[in-house]
Amino acid sequence: MATVNQLVRKPRARKVAKSNVPALEACPQKRGVCTRVYTTTPKKPNSALRKVCRVRLTNGFEVTSYIGGEGHNLQEHSVILIRGGRVKDLPGVRYHTVRGALDCSGVKDRKQARSKYGVKRPKA
């Protein structure tokens, strides 16, 4: 425990919070261009081919972004919007692609949780 005199000489240092999504630079989303679209395998014990893409953002960062939902239309040079949110079983993937924004289409035939996958309300 520090004495009053010690605290007068050198106050307590505040802990600096470290961002989980540094490339967003405190913005809710960022726009970027796909430089590579590919699949990768998750950590043990999971098994799949997860769809991801490398994205060059407008601020110069290059990050890996997960493409959620079944099927996508992304290819190299597609302009997409990314948001924060990591994928627990893919090391190094700390961003999600926003479906239904810019060049990324919504998920086809999606009926539930539509707002998360950029799908309009079906007609009747």
From Swiss-Prot:
PROSITE patterns xrefs: RIBOSOMAL_S12
State how changing residue 43 to R affects the protein, per the record.
Confers streptomycin resistance but not hyperaccurate translation
State the CDD domains in the record.
Ribosomal_S12
Q: Which residues form a coiled coil?
A: none
N6-acetyllysine modification sites?
108
- InterPro entries named in the record: NA-bd_OB-fold (IPR012340), Ribosomal_uS12 (IPR006032), Ribosomal_uS12_bac (IPR005679)
Q: Which GO terms describe its biological process?
A: cytoplasmic translation; Group I intron splicing; maintenance of translational fidelity; positive regulation of RNA splicing; response to antibiotic; RNA folding; translation
User: What Gene Ontology terms describe where this protein resides (cellular component)?
Assistant: cytoplasm; cytosol; cytosolic small ribosomal subunit; ribosome
The record's listing under Gene3D superfamilies reads:
Nucleic acid-binding proteins
Q: Which GO terms describe its molecular function?
A: misfolded RNA binding; rRNA binding; structural constituent of ribosome; tRNA binding
Q: What else is known?
A: At least 19 substitutions or deletions in 11 codons can promote streptomycin resistance, dependence or pseudodependence; all but one of the streptomycin resistant mutations (K42R) are associated with hyperaccurate translation and thus reduced translational efficiency. The streptomycin sensitive allele is dominant to resistant alleles.
Subunit field text: Part of the 30S ribosomal subunit. Contacts proteins S8 and S17. Interacts with ArfA. May interact with IF1 in the 30S initiation complex.
- Protein family: Belongs to the universal ribosomal protein uS12 family.
Record function comment: With S4 and S5 plays an important role in translational accuracy. Interacts with and stabilizes bases of the 16S rRNA that are involved in tRNA selection in the A site and with the mRNA backbone. Located at the interface of the 30S and 50S subunits, it traverses the body of the 30S subunit contacting proteins on the other side and probably holding the rRNA structure together. The combined cluster of proteins S8, S12 and S17 appears to hold together the shoulder and platform of the 30S subunit.
The identity of this protein, by name, is Small ribosomal subunit protein uS12
